[in-house]
Every structure is written in structure tokens, then in C-alpha cells.
Amino acid sequence: MTLASIRRGYHVIKTLLQYGLDDVLPPKMTPWYFKLARNSLFWIRNKHKGKSGGERLKLAMQELGPVYIKLGQMLSTRRDLLSDEWANELAMLQDKVPPFDGALARQAIEAELKAPIESFFDDFNETPLASASISQVHTATLKSNGKAVVLKVLRPNVEAKIQADLLLMSQTAKVIDYLLGEGNRLRPSEVIEDYRVTILGELNLKLEALNAIKLRNNFLDSDALYIPYVYEEFCYPRLMVMERIYGIPVSDIAALKAQGTNFKLLAERGVELFFTQVFRDNFFHADMHPGNIFISRDHPENPYYIGLDCGIMGTLSEVDKRYLAENFLAFFNRDYHRIAQLYIESGWVSEKTDLQAFEQAIKVVCEPMFNKPLDEISFGHVLLELFRTARHFDIVVQPQLVLLEKTLLYIEGLGRQLYPQLDLWQTAKPFLEQWMAEQVGPKAMFKKVSTKLPYWSDKLPEFPELIYDNLKLGRKLLSSQQQMLDKYLKYQQQAHKSNYLLITSAILLICGTLLFNQDATLWSPYVCLISGAALWIIGWRSRPKNRKF
């Protein structure tokens, strides 16, 4: 551990204690040695006693910087772990940091390009268009065609800083795991590992560029979503170049109203986009907070979304997709038994789970939701409450489903912000029912066969040879097994013969000894002893030598 990491660790502890976060820890996490350590830091006092626990955590993370801000944002989506009060406070964290020097950005860009910026771009603006904790965005125009572009570049030394904070978080999580013991609901190490994978993925701008290209290709003919063009030839792990867009931030409701945007159509398209990404393409944008979404300025009566920042993308297995769709349909049909079955069949909870107890727990949580109209029921909260319930039955956390839940909550919140009367169920139900219909029945079977047909037709000419080879191999195996059986039987015969001779020799030797002790003048003891010794020698020498067969 370096001096810098010790200094950083002390700063983190000091900040957490100054916000009195030790006061909100459960008794399990404050054994006598924790209290002793806390009392030894007597000069660090709680300066925010009047604030709630959630607000104090938010302020502490804001003070600790970008890595902790992003962790807080991620935790705000884990409502299966945190109370709504704490989650709502963390959701207010903003990833806003002062920009770094434009000259440093120029150096970083030129290091990736291995050439001066002016070799490829004109009008490079050293004043950033936007700045965040991991990267910064600058504007320019392409020298080759004069088109406006943005250059996204990582902050200097950001990787080392993030790795150092992640190591500290991981070590702290292990301590908390130890203090909470087996069976704790929070599972800090699991949370930090999910966060580590997410944030390290954001450090590779080449990967983000490839994600954006794939998402753009999925919606090339769409009138609902536009992904800016990515100039792949200028994309590297620390640099990404893409088309500049001029949309209206989705959070700027006043500007959207001023241009006469069709909010109902926009909200419905948002829901359709989510389900299309998940169920049609199996590739969904998992970071759809308002800062990454813009609305087109042209054709406000037929608006479309503009999506940015494809650093975090999610995918589901075919099994997960099917179980998820069935879950939603079962919920709105109030089939709680089927929901419980689906969680067990999918492997999300253990097959040893008490099905009746699990079904009853789901019913207790979900039934009150039907006291409100269908158009007021939140898909995201349905999924959230199901996960919370399953948590008590030791659910195996699926990171891809956590991403999905977060995205669904974003989309729902956004849709109802744009159009409060949005009936999410009526918008999504036809899509889910159509998708389920495509997964079962003759049509689905024909589609699956059609998908496999090229592979089968490629392998068909090899079938006769494969059948012949397998028959030949079968004969060899049969012959080999017969040989092994013969050897085994021969071994058993030899073993039985040897054992018989050894036992007989032992009996003769014992009898000879007893007779000799009674009357040494008789000839019978000598016959017994000599015969016994001879049989023992024959039996010993006739033992099978090789046990391999």
C-alpha cells in the first residue's frame, strides 16, 4: 500500500465521519473494536447532525469526487438494496466536474492520433463543450468534408485514479461483508464488483464507439431513434470522434413545448424503443438518463430521440428474455403462482425455494398495486418489487437484469414526465404478446429450424461418414469391453483359486500344529504341516500378478 493510497483512505474515512455516516450503521457493523477505532479519531466530528442519512451520504459522495458520485448514481438504481429515501437522495447526484485544461486535451488527442490535430481537423475549440468525471468533449470540423464533429477524450490519469479508488472500495466492501456475516442482503462486494465492471467499461472509448455503431445500425430505418455517426477511423481507447448533433435536451420541457412537440407520441415511442432494444435486438442502452437523451428540432409533430453515450450497454440471454416477458404478462394476469415458478425455472432463485411461501410473498407485495388504475402501474416498480421480494429468498443477482431495471425506471420516469397520462401497459402489452407469440407455436418452430438449416445443410454430407465412424468406434468399444471382461473373469478365477489354496494351507497348518502338540510320535501332524506348507507356496505363487484390465 502506497503513501498516496493511505492518504486517500484517510480522506475517505474523514469525509464519511464528518457527515456522521457511522451513526446510521446497523449494530452488526459496529462491534467493540469498531467503536474503539472510531473513538480514537476523536478530532473528527459529525458536522451535519440535522440532515437525514440519505442526504448525508449524497453530500459525502459529492465531496469524495467522480468515482464515488458514479457509485452513488449506480446505487440509486438498486432500490432492491436501499430504501426509497436513500435512493431518491442518491439519484440527485450530478456528474459535473470542472473541465481540465484544453491544452492537456489537445496533447491527449494528438497522442492517440500520433499527429497534430490540424492534420485531420479544423476549428478545434480548446474550450470544452461539456465536461464529466471521466471524459471531456471538444468541438471541431473534419478537414476532409467540413462536417461538424465532437471529440471525446479521457481525462489525464483517470484510469490510475479510478483503479486506486476501486481497490479501496473493494477492501472496504470485504470488511463490511465480514462484519455483516453470511446471508446479508446488502452484499457489498457484489455491488462493488458490478460497479467495477461498469466503470472500467466506460474507460474504453473504442468500445463505446463500437457500441454506438451497432446501436445506430439497429435503428438505421427508424423514425423513433437517431444515433450520431461515429468516425471509426479516429476512435481509440482514449479518443472517440462522432457527428455533432443539435437537439433539445429531453429535460428542457419548456423548449420542447415552445416548438410544439407531440409529447404523447414522444412518450409512447420511448416505451416502444425500450422494448424493441430488449426483445428485438437484445442490445439496449443501459445509461438512458436525461443527460444522454436529446429530442430532434425538426418535425416536432413527429419527434424522434437522439441517443448519446453508449458506454454502458446491456444484453439478455434468450432464456432471460422469455422469462422476463412471461413475468410481466403473468403479473398483469395476477398469476402469482406462475411468477414464482418463473423465478425458480430461470435459476434466479434456488430450486430449493419453498414455492408456496414465495408465491404468497409475491402476492402480498403485488396485489396492492392493483388498487390503482392500470395506466398508473409502473413496470419498473413491478420488477423492482419482485426483485426485492426474491431478495429475501436468496436471489442470485443477475447484473444484466439490474441494468434492465435501471433502464426501465429511467424510460418510465421520462415517459411520464413528457406525458403524464402515458398508459405503459397498453403501449407495451401488444409488443410483449406479439413477441411471446413468435417464441412458441409452429411459426416459432419454423423460424428456429430456418435459422439452423444452413448449419444442418453444411453438416449433412458428413452424416454417412459420421455414422460409419461411430459404428466402427462402437465395434471397437464392444471388442475392447469384451477383452476387459475376459481379463477380469480370468483374474477372478486366479484370485479364487489362490485364496482357496491359501485358506486350505492355513487350516492344514493349524491342524498339524494342534496334533503335534498332542502327540509328536504320530505321522499325521507331519503330513498336515508338510501339505499345508506346500499348498501355501502353490497358492502364493498362483496369485494374479496384474490387476489392469
UniProtKB/Swiss-Prot annotation:
Metabolic or biological pathway, per its Swiss-Prot or TrEMBL entry: Cofactor biosynthesis; ubiquinone biosynthesis [regulation]
Q: Please tell me where ATP binds in this chain.
A: 129-137, 152
User: Which first-to-last residue range defines the signal peptide?
Assistant: none
One GO cellular component term noted in the UniProt record for this chain? plasma membrane
The transmembrane segments are: 498-518, 520-540
Q: What is this protein called?
A: Probable protein kinase UbiB
Pfam families given in the database record: ABC1
Q: What is its EC number?
A: 2.7.-.-
Q: What range(s) does the Protein kinase domain occupy?
A: 123-501
In its keyword annotation, does this UniProt entry include Cell membrane?
A: yes
Domain of life (superkingdom): Bacteria
Keyword annotations: ATP-binding, Cell inner membrane, Cell membrane, Kinase, Membrane, Nucleotide-binding, Transferase, Transmembrane, Transmembrane helix, Ubiquinone biosynthesis
A biological process (GO) of this protein is: ubiquinone biosynthetic process
Membrane topology type, per the record? Multi-pass membrane protein
Q: Which HAMAP family match?
A: UbiB
